[in-house]
Swiss-Prot record:
GO BP of this protein: DNA damage checkpoint signaling
Protein name: Checkpoint protein HUS1B
InterPro entries listed in its UniProt record: Cell_cycle_HUS1, Hus1/Mec3
Domain of life where this protein originates: Eukaryota
Family under the similarity heading: Belongs to the HUS1 family.
Pfam families: Hus1 (PF04005)
Gene Ontology terms: cellular component: checkpoint clamp complex; nucleolus
Record note on quaternary structure: Interacts with RAD1 and RAD9B.
Length: 276
């Protein structure tokens, strides 16, 4: 098995840093699932905890070369400590390139090379050898995208910066936030304690076409669907977002799950936050 990749775009390097940092906050162990056309981030969190599923298409990388377990099963699953990955790329924001390679340093390693400009015409390389476990095929089933049945409502999110500021303020008041949305493009956030209730209203957000189809099935578009989630877990989803997504979607499974989808060009992030 072989894997080599290189990112030279500053914005994609920043997003790689951001995803790695978020994964480290959600799970101690992460699996990088390497496929011929994309790279997946698969945090191995506990059942019932918030989860993230990240996906980077091959076009994100200036160079991408891999050979999987076999021609039939052309994938590689690398298990590593999430914190190790986050630390290795933490200071790569000003790097001219970020290289990833599966190597053998007495044991399998994911070698990260951060190339930094030291003076005009010269670069210096910071190398990190992260121990990894190459998962056998019988474990690949644990690295698949989380399955979510059809949501009860889908609505486009407001500007993430606005939403993050609102969630931060609410986190200082209460530990949980009630998220509501309907098929008329409305979304509400509510935090409530014995002494105070704070509620934010968003309207005219719009709904994706498949959600609007529910209206033709006799469903009242004004009916609000809700889920109550941990404020800190919701805030983690917006932490560090430096690149605005081209599409941001909120899916709610009534009183069960908050599912957020952020898409930016060839990168997509999904957050799964269970009700609490």
């Amino acid at each position: 098995m072989r894997f080599r990749a290189r990112i030279t775009s500053k914005r994609f390097i920043e997003l790689f840093i951001q995803v790695s940092s978020t994964v480290a906050k959600l799970a101690k162990v992460c699996v990088l699932r390497v496929c011929p056309d994309r790279l997946y981030f698969c945090p191995m969190g506990l059942l019932g905890e918030a989860q993230l599923w990240g996906e980077m298409r091959r076009d994100v990388f200036h160079h991408f070369c891999m050979e999987g377990a076999s021609q039939e099963f052309n994938e590689i699953c690398l298990e590593l400590m999430s914190e190790h990955l986050a630390r290795a790329v933490k200071n790569a924001g000003n790097a001219s390139s970020l290289k990833l390679q599966l190597t053998n340093k007495q044991r399998p390693c994911l070698t990260l090379v951060v190339e930094l400009a030291s003076c005009p015409g010269h670069t210096r390389a910071v190398v990190h050898d992260l121990p990894v476990r190459v998962l056998p095929r019988r474990r690949w089933k644990d690295c698949t995208e989380p399955h979510v049945r059809g949501s009860d409502v889908s609505v486009y999110l407001p500007a993430l910066k606005t939403l993050k500021n609102m969630v931060e303020r609410m986190a200082n008041v209460g530990s949980h936030v009630l998220v509501e949305a309907n098929l008329n493009g409305r979304m509400n956030l509510t935090v409530e304690t014995d002494r105070v209730t704070i509620k934010s209203y968003f309207k005219n957000l719009g709904n994706p076409p498949n959600a609007v189809l529910c209206m033709s099935q006799g469903r009242d578009p004004e009916t609000m669907v809700q889920v109550r989630v941990d404020n800190r877990k919701l805030l983690q989803c917006f932490d560090g977002h430096q690149i605005n997504p081209t599409m941001a979607l909120c899916n709610i499974l009534s009183n069960t799950l908050l599912h957020l989808v952020l898409v930016h060009e060839d990168i997509s992030l999904q957050y799964f936050i269970p009700a609490s």
